[in-house]
From Swiss-Prot:
Covalent S-S links between cysteines: none
InterPro entries per the UniProt record, alphabetical: Ribosomal_Su5_D2-typ_SF, Ribosomal_uS9, Ribosomal_uS9_bac/plastid, Ribosomal_uS9_CS, Ribsml_uS5_D2-typ_fold_subgr
Biological source species: Bacillus cereus (strain ATCC 14579 / DSM 31 / CCUG 7414 / JCM 2152 / NBRC 15305 / NCIMB 9373 / NCTC 2599 / NRRL B-3711)
Name of the protein in its database record: Small ribosomal subunit protein uS9
Gene Ontology CC: cytosolic small ribosomal subunit
Keywords tagged on the record: Ribonucleoprotein, Ribosomal protein
Highest taxon in the source lineage: Bacteria
GO molecular function terms listed in the Swiss-Prot or TrEMBL record: RNA binding; structural constituent of ribosome
C-alpha cells in the first residue's frame, strides 16, 4: 500500500527547498545526505528542527529534502519554511502554533543591489576634503 506523504515548498533568499514528510523515526535527509553532514553549523541545524520542535513531532516523521540555490543560511531557512508548510498539510491544527512561532511567513529579506557611484549597496567612496 502507498505510504502517506506530505509535501511543502520553502523559500529563503535564493534557495528553494522541496520537502517531503513521511511517517518514520525522525531522520532528516537533505540532497541524499544526512543533515548532520550536510549542514556544518549546529545553529543552522537547530533552525531546520524548529518546526518539528514547535509542534512536538520531532520523532514522528522522516524529512526528505531537495534543496538548491543559495548558501547554508538560505538553505536552512528554506528547509524550515518547507517543513512548516508540509506539517500544516499533515495536520491543519498546527497552524496556530506554527504561525505564532513565525514559521509560516516567507522571510522576504533579500540582498540589496549595488548602486552605481557607490562601492556597495550603501557604502560610498571615501570622502576627501582636499
Amino acid at each position: 500500500m502507498a505510504q502517506v506523504q506530505y509535501y511543502g515548498t520553502g523559500r529563503r533568499k535564493s534557495s528553494v527547498a522541496r520537502v517531503r514528510l513521511v511517517p518514520g523515526e525522525g531522520r532528516v535527509i537533505i540532497n541524499g545526505r544526512d543533515f548532520e553532514n550536510y549542514i556544518p553549523f549546529a545553529a543552522l541545524r537547530e533552525v531546520v528542527k524548529q518546526p518539528l520542535v514547535a509542534t512536538e513531532t520531532l520523532g514522528n516523521y522522516d524529512v526528505l529534502v531537495n534543496v538548491n540555490g543559495g548558501g547554508y543560511t538560505g538553505q536552512a531557512g528554506a528547509i524550515r519554511h518547507g517543513i512548516s508548510r508540509a506539517l500544516l498539510k499533515a495536520d491543519p491544527e498546527y497552524r496556530l502554533t506554527l504561525k505564532r512561532a513565525g514559521l509560516l511567513t516567507r522571510d522576504a529579506r533579500m540582498k540589496e543591489r549595488k548602486k552605481y557611484g557607490l562601492k556597495g549597496a550603501r557604502r560610498a567612496p571615501q570622502f576627501s576634503k582636499r
